[in-house]
């Protein structure tokens, strides 16, 4: 049965997740506590908000609260950073196994395993059939055998990051259809995309909270606590950070927590000669939230990239472009080593390029063999949109074609009898490098992205065929 192992809220995801800073978001978390403990409340709660308003952070903290109260049914934190965590077909299998493992309903695990054994072709099922066989039937039967009073809560975060929004709409439809008769609740977060808003069009079926409509003064107070906490953590001087500059930074953040988080990372970036100077530079710039919800974030991203590209030569600029292409458009996060192999850039050049991008890209401290990724989905939105990113725009079609050719080039370079591998997921070949495994698994996906065009020359296919078909 397909499932996403990195979808649980506390999993070691490519970009680490965290809960809310202490004493922030108290109102919404208190509201969610009351909803979770009230069996007469609606079975579905939708937290929606624009990009960067803190939905995932709230969902993480709420999951922690539920777990501490022994009322967490399961979590699926969707993310575009991995194929499985963006696949809607993985949500129900992942959730039902978590719910069964928590043993709120003693007979549930046995019932689900029986359902899987009886239906080996379940991977190809439609969402409605999955939900009926792995949630509705076993959960209804298991509930008869328990005295559970408080309904466990299933947390589904960032559904807007799933790759097929038509399947998300299908999932929401079956949740609404069956939720009133099930002994579980559903907490769902997403951006207010049009298709998702249509799914939540009937207000009597759910509770909802619009995060970007919270009173601005409440959000500003929370953002101020966050900024002070972060900057104090990196500099504990008595007069740091200056209150006037904190207030200016709070005003610049508007209601965007991701703006405050990105600015703080930028100010405290490793190797920064002067945090005070960076703070002063930021607050004296023109990055206010003057128009549009994400407008200030786009300007901030542009400012950080301006600094990263400053004083670079042509080769260094090309390296940054290529690295960002791999980080933003790879279907799974790659390590620095794998990016070096795949995109043909020495590791020392990658590390040099990334040194000024720590506020945009998560780079683990454990070394070059750990995957790196963008901190937030809004950076993908920025870099892939020509209107938003202007001179830093990385065309998706050109980028996918570039990666596809690099995949084939790598396969061609390392081809040998020893390097033959199976394309089948079941075969574990530890001698195959991360970059080669990625290339063999994903070159066709990159080539089939929208208008990329013909997959490759006959010569490439003939040369590389043995690697990915053997």
Roles of regions detected by a PLM:
Residues 440, 444-470:
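Short, well-ordered secondary-structure microsegments
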Residues 411, 415, 431-438:
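Amphipathic helix-loop-helix modules that constitute alpha-helical solenoid scaffolds
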Residues 103, 415, 451-454:
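Long, hydrophobic, amphipathic alpha-helical segments used as structural scaffolds
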Residues 1-404, 409, 419-430, 457-469:
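Conserved NB-ARC/NACHT P-loop NTPase core of NLR-like innate immune receptors
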Residues 321, 380, 437-444:
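Alpha-helical repeat solenoid scaffolds
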């Amino acid at each position: 049965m397909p499932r996403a192992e990195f979808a649980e809220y506390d999993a070691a995801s490519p970009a680490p997740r965290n809960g809310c800073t202490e004493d922030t978001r108290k109102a919404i978390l208190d509201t969610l506590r009351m909803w979770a403990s009230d069996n007469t409340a609606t079975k579905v709660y939708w937290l929606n908000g624009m990009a960067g308003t803190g939905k995932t952070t709230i969902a993480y903290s709420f999951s922690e609260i539920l777990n501490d109260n022994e009322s967490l049914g399961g979590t699926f934190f969707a993310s575009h950073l991995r194929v499985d965590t963006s696949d809607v077909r993985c949500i129900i299998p992942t959730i039902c196994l978590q719910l069964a493992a928590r043993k709120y309903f003693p007979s549930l695990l046995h019932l689900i395993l029986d359902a899987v054994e009886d239906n080996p072709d379940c991977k190809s099922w439609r969402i409605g059939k999955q939900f009926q066989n792995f949630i509705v039937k076993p959960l209804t039967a298991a509930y008869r055998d328990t005295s559970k009073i408080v309904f466990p809560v299933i947390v589904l975060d960032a559904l807007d990051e799933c790759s097929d929004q038509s399947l998300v709409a299908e999932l929401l439809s079956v949740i609404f259809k069956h939720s009133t008769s099930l002994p579980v609740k559903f907490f769902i977060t997403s951006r207010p995309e049009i298709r998702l808003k249509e799914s939540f069009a009937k207000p009597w079926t759910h509770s909802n909270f619009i995060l970007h409509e919270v009173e601005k003064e409440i959000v500003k107070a929370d953002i101020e606590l966050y900024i002070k906490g972060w900057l104090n953590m990196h500099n504990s001087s008595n007069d740091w950070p200056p209150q006037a500059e904190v207030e200016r930074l709070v005003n610049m953040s508007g209601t965007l927590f991701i703006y405050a988080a990105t600015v703080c990372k930028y100010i405290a970036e490793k190797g920064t000669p002067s945090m005070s100077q960076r703070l002063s530079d930021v607050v004296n710039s023109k990055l206010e939230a003057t128009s549009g919800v994400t407008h200030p974030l786009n300007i901030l991203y542009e400012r950080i990239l301006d600094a990263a590209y400053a004083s670079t030569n042509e080769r260094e600029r090309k390296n940054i472009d290529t690295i960002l292409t791999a980080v933003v458009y790879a279907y799974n996060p790659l390590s620095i080593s794998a990016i070096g192999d795949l995109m043909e850039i020495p590791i020392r050049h990658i590390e040099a390029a990334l040194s000024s991008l720590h506020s945009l890209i998560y780079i683990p401290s454990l070394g070059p063999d750990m995957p790196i990724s963008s901190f937030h989905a809004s950076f993908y939105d920025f870099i892939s949109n020509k209107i938003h990113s202007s001179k830093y725009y990385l065309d998706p079609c050109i980028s996918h074609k570039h990666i596809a050719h690099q995949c084939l080039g790598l396969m061609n370079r390392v081809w040998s009898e020893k390097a033959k591998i199976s394309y089948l997921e079941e075969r574990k070949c530890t001698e195959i490098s991360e970059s080669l495994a990625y290339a063999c698994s994903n070159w066709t996906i990159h080539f089939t992205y929208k208008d990329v065009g013909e997959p490759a020359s006959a010569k490439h296919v003939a040369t590389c065929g043995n690697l990915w078909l053997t």
